[in-house]
């Protein structure tokens, strides 16, 4: 059976198929969205879905808090991609654009839909912690694939980026009063 180029490269995959592949840590999907500029909108949808799932999973506030969490998730995503771009591309010699990092890091949040499990009494925190670890691994893969360098450099970029991200997030929270959301990182 012959396959089309779109089937081979994955272009044209549905949002759900891309999210599933990203959650399975399939490096091919990270390469795919890195090079597909039209996937930026899909990556933004992933960030929004994950933010809503996290808000439901935390079940601590009403609609206003959920709205703030979604806004914070988007700001966090933009900041995280920007900081990662500056460190990975400009300091450590990777090769990526900010848009490529936006897309790969957006899809790296795919496992975050399981943050909704945080609502489970007594065990929710454990599920949230496991999802956070999963997101960390997905983020490192996204960074590695987008910047086209080693896993070691991706880990270094993630660690340095996280430290810088925390400083920027705290500054934004202090000035604007919006929690930039650590789930985005």
Predicted segments, located by residue:
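Selected alpha-helical membrane-embedding segments in polytopic membrane proteins
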Residues: 2-97
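Hydrophobic alpha-helical transmembrane segments in multi-pass membrane proteins
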Residues: 41-85, 103-139, 156-180
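Short, strongly hydrophobic alpha-helical membrane anchors
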Residues: 181-185
